[in-house]
């Protein structure tokens, strides 16, 4: 196989993977679970230090299997019941009795959570204590990327600089562009990319769960009620918005089902998957074409997001939906040029959406960006595109660079202000 394509598949396998619950509190649960394996016994006290962005994205979201919100329960649950071998599915097997045990630690004032100053956007340091024993695990640069382990102050593991610098772009040093992604998705042997169909299965189950039960703001179920009442129609646009939002409803509401995530975000994995799957159903395409479209969507989203930090004041569902829209054009038989039009259109439409933490209303943001994806792919099929207006350049690659520049140079103070507001 083309060595470059092997690199693309490696990227996908690295950052498109199942995640149970919002990945920021789950990072704390994972760190706690790893620390517990070092400590060897149930901790008497837990200390958690996190970056501002990880704190922001943990304040308002349910931790799966617990029915509770926040970093304290995530860390306590990880220490009591976490499976350190399960990565982002660390809490998959937690029981009600273990949740109660974790809550007892919190109620006794034995779980402390605080923000810490760090250059890393994803940072979590968990310390467990039991008697004279102490275990520390530090995560840095990625939700499950361990930078350091210590037992009773002695180093057990320290990652080298190259391994721990994951906050840098995952695409650094790789020849990648929208054009090369499009070509790869079209030409790579099908048997090499069948794995991406798991995204359809996992995120589809989350959508079904969100439609069946009252999670969060019930955005998906509310739209279903509107369809049943004849207020809105059940066309492709509304189905995509409804079912994408329903999956996010379930995820943000603590459903005990994993999402297939994209670059550390379950919601963005949902946004990269469900609109593409529903469009494939609408056009009655083959499983192979669906897989190629999902590769286009997920890898396209990863590439665009590699131009800015993994956590910021920018809602990544925007550019994820841009990549989904690109894939939707491909499904509908459009050209590469029209796929680029779709990306331009989505970014022009909804790039002003901010991230003010993970919470139930993320389902509304997912639905907003997904609706933009539908409008944009329809416009693109009609060869209508935004070009040379505002931050949208005449070339899609330049537009992507502009987005990165806007976030890196223009939104850092916005992020500080948002976190300050949320912490007041």
Curated annotation (Swiss-Prot):
GO molecular function: L-cysteine desulfhydrase activity
InterPro entries: Ser_deHydtase-like_asu, UPF0597
Pfam family, one: SDH_alpha
GO BP, one annotated term: L-cysteine catabolic process to pyruvate
Family: Belongs to the UPF0597 family.
Protein name listed in UniProt: UPF0597 protein Sputw3181_2955
């Amino acid at each position: 196989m083309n060595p470059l394509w092997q690199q693309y598949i490696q990227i996908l396998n690295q950052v498109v993977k199942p995640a149970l619950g919002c990945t920021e509190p789950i990072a704390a649960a994972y760190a706690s679970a790893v620390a517990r394996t070092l400590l060897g016994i149930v901790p008497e006290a837990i200390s958690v230090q996190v970056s501002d962005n990880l704190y922001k994205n943990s304040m308002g979201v349910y931790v799966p299997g617990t029915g509770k919100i926040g970093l304290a329960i995530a860390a306590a649950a990880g220490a009591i019941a976490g499976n350190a071998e399960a990565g982002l599915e660390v809490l998959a097997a937690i029981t009600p009795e273990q949740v109660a045990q974790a809550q007892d630690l919190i109620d006794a004032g034995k779980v402390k959570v605080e923000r810490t100053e760090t250059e890393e956007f994803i940072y979590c340091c968990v310390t467990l204590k039991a008697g004279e024993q102490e275990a520390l695990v530090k995560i840095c640069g990625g939700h499950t990327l361990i930078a350091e382990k210590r037992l009773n102050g002695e180093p057990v593991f320290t990652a080298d600089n190259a391994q721990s610098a994951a906050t840098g772009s995952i695409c650094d040093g790789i020849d990648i562009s929208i054009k090369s992604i499009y070509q790869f998705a079209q030409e790579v042997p099908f048997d090499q990319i069948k794995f991406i169909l798991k995204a359809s299965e996992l995120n589809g189950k989350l959508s079904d769960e969100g439609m069946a039960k009252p999670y969060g703001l019930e955005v998906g179920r509310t739209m279903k009620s509107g369809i049943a009442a004849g207020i809105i129609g059940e066309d492709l646009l509304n189905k995509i918005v409804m079912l994408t939002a329903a999956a996010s409803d379930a995820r943000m509401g603590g459903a005990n089902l994993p999402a297939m995530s994209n670059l550390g975000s379950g919601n963005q994995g949902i946004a990269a998957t469900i609109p593409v799957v529903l469009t494939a159903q609408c056009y009655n395409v083959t499983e192979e074409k669906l897989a190629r479209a999902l590769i286009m969507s997920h890898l396209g989203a990863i590439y665009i997001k590699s131009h800015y930090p993994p956590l910021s004041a920018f809602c990544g569902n925007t550019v994820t939906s841009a990549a989904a829209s690109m894939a939707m054009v491909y499904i509908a038989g459009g050209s590469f040029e029209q796929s680029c039009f779709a990306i331009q259109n989505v970014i022009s439409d909804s790039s002003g959406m901010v991230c003010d933490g993970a919470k139930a209303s993320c389902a509304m943001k997912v639905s907003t960006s997904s609706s933009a994806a539908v409008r944009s792919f329809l416009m693109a099929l009609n060869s209508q595109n935004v070009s040379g207006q505002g931050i949208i350049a005449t070339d899609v690659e330049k537009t992507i660079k502009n987005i990165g520049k806007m976030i890196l140079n223009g939104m850092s103070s916005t992020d500080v202000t948002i976190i300050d507001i949320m912490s007041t």
